[in-house]
Amino acid sequence: MTLVCGRVNFFSGPHLVFKYWLRGKFMRIIIVGCGKVGSSIASELNLEGHEISVVDINHGAVDKLANSLDVLGIEGNGATYDVLIEAGAEYADLLIAATARDEINLYSCLMAKAAGVTHTIARVRNPEYTNDLYRIKEHLGLSMAINPEQTAANEISRLLRFSGALEIDSFSKGVVELIKVTVPQ
């Protein structure tokens, strides 16, 4: 017998929202940062058929990504207005700032909003900044700020809490969890 039960979680995280935004919708997306994270995001979104522009100050990283994926590569500082305009910010639906520096990511999102980008997502790893994420999101107009280490820790903790679960689904931005377990007869 299989039992499905629900649980409300009052600590909501951003980890699933990103996927729901993109599902079944063509978007023009700018990714600032061509490191491991930025490259992985570009690769995934490229497979889904989105129009991608990547921006990085490292010529080699931009060139490698532009030659391996169907993306527009721009060499330059993704925190500057002119470079974002060159990458297509005036028509972009989403900017994802995934450089190694939180300050660059936040400033890139601020400049992207000024250039007309609809939604912005910043990778923010510094715990001092993550404590103020709600204020940062409100004042900078961020759609989402993600701390990958914190998100991974939360996900591991969630899986350990329900180690016998066959399936765990989150709804309502992580506030509600639906858990599927097998109950012995």
Kindly label every feature range from the protein language model.
Residues 1-3, 7-9, 14-185:
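Cytosolic regulatory regions of ion transport systems
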